[in-house]
Amino acid sequence: MRTLLLLVLVAFAAPALAQRSYDQDVLGALLGREAPLPAAPPAYAVWHVEHESGNSILARHALYERAGEGDVALGRERLALAQLLGETEAGLLRTGDTLVLPARPADFDLSPLAYAPYPREWPGAAEIDKAVVVDKTTQTWAGYERGRLVRWGPASTGAAETPTPSGRFTMNWRALERESSEAPPGERWLMRYVMNIHAARGIHLHQYDVVPTGPPQGHGCIRMVTSDAEWLWGWSDGWQTTAGPGALGGRPTAPGTLVIVQGEEPDGAPLRFVDGPNGPERVAVMLPPDPLAVPRGDR
């Protein structure tokens, strides 16, 4: 009986201990949303999942009702934003849980750029056509055009034992699909929209079906959700070579899009919010004053 009880406890504990990953369909809809971008970021607050009955279903219903300003369906739709902010998806919330969300329900409907941990303007990159930043501390990435933020999203870098190298890179060769060489025998790890930044070590930005929300677990590459990887593939440029743009063979004649990798791998959940004088505040990613002065990371 004791053995059976132990097995039951393990079976129920395993899902709770498992690493969560982003719902890529939900994020794809959010990241591609065209909506107003206010001059200042929204204020945030701690939202509580609670109901006098203690019932989690009723507590979630109350949360939806509050977020939707009385419209439960709208509130459920708005709560999808929790995933972009790295919070627990609404359907998994239980009584007693808390999550950080915009303080005003109307601020759930803004442009995804409004929720970015990155500055809207990067003066140091104002003369650079396109620049990409990967921040390991927050496990996010961002794209800038002439110093203006145009896209951002979640990312998952290398684990502490196989870290993504920091420094300045440029995009090299690229491939629409590629199988990872890190896959165990008999397994097939397919990557799409592969954009290499370190040829010698095989470090890429790429799409992957599993992008963890917690500590990074990769082998050095930068995992991205499908919508972001596809966007970045179309927006960025690989190197120019005598064999063609972004080709694996040939002699390089011009570098591709600039990529800066910075920060430190988090031990636990990535840093997303900090305590401010009036409540939680979005963490602010600091960017280098001169990205071209950042030491190269591929040497």
Indicate where each model-derived feature is located.
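N-terminal signal peptide c-region/cleavage motif recognized by signal peptidases
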Residues: 11-14
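Extracellular LysM carbohydrate-binding repeats and other cell-envelope/extracellular binding modules
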Residues: 23, 27-28, 35-39, 74-117
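Extracytoplasmic
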Residues: 41-44, 77, 94-98, 126-129, ...
